[in-house]
Swiss-Prot record:
<dbReference type="InterPro" id="IPR035566">
    <property type="entry name" value="Ribosomal_protein_bL20_C"/>
</dbReference>
<keyword id="KW-0934">Plastid</keyword>
<comment type="similarity">
    <text>Belongs to the bacterial ribosomal protein bL20 family.</text>
</comment>
<comment type="function">
    <text>Binds directly to 23S ribosomal RNA and is necessary for the in vitro assembly process of the 50S ribosomal subunit. It is not involved in the protein synthesizing functions of that subunit.</text>
</comment>
<dbReference type="InterPro" id="IPR049946">
    <property type="entry name" value="RIBOSOMAL_L20_CS"/>
</dbReference>
<dbReference type="GO" id="GO:0006412">
    <property type="term" value="P:translation"/>
</dbReference>
<dbReference type="GO" id="GO:0070111">
    <property type="term" value="C:organellar chromatophore"/>
</dbReference>
<dbReference type="GO" id="GO:0009536">
    <property type="term" value="C:plastid"/>
</dbReference>
<protein>
    <recommendedName>
        <fullName>Large ribosomal subunit protein bL20c</fullName>
    </recommendedName>
</protein>
<keyword id="KW-0699">rRNA-binding</keyword>
<keyword id="KW-0687">Ribonucleoprotein</keyword>
<keyword id="KW-0994">Organellar chromatophore</keyword>
<dbReference type="GO" id="GO:1990904">
    <property type="term" value="C:ribonucleoprotein complex"/>
</dbReference>
<dbReference type="Pfam" id="PF00453">
    <property type="entry name" value="Ribosomal_L20"/>
</dbReference>
<dbReference type="GO" id="GO:0019843">
    <property type="term" value="F:rRNA binding"/>
</dbReference>
<keyword id="KW-0694">RNA-binding</keyword>
<keyword id="KW-0689">Ribosomal protein</keyword>
Amino acid sequence: MARVKRGNIARKRRNKILRLARGFRGSNGSLFRTANQRVMKALCNAYRDRRRRKRDFRRLWIARINAASRLNGLSYSRLVGSLKKANIKLNRKMLALLALADPTSFANVVVVAKS
């Protein structure tokens, strides 16, 4: 079998990994073997946390809406149920933003939902 010289290709592959590992601490950013492990782990964490971020933000919005609606004498679940009955189509992100930035408008939304 013919000899395969792949020094250039291997170097490019290793440099690609080392570029991804720039900024990592110690040998994790400079030695290929440890950098490769750290990069693979980092990419796994990034993939997982892109999905987790959606859940976390939804939980945050619900907590904010719940706190603001309780100040107006209504629990979160009752508020969401009455918003659906009143056919008010505000999503949780917008409701949380309204509760945080403009509490009087949020109180008006709660009053409309109650009636």
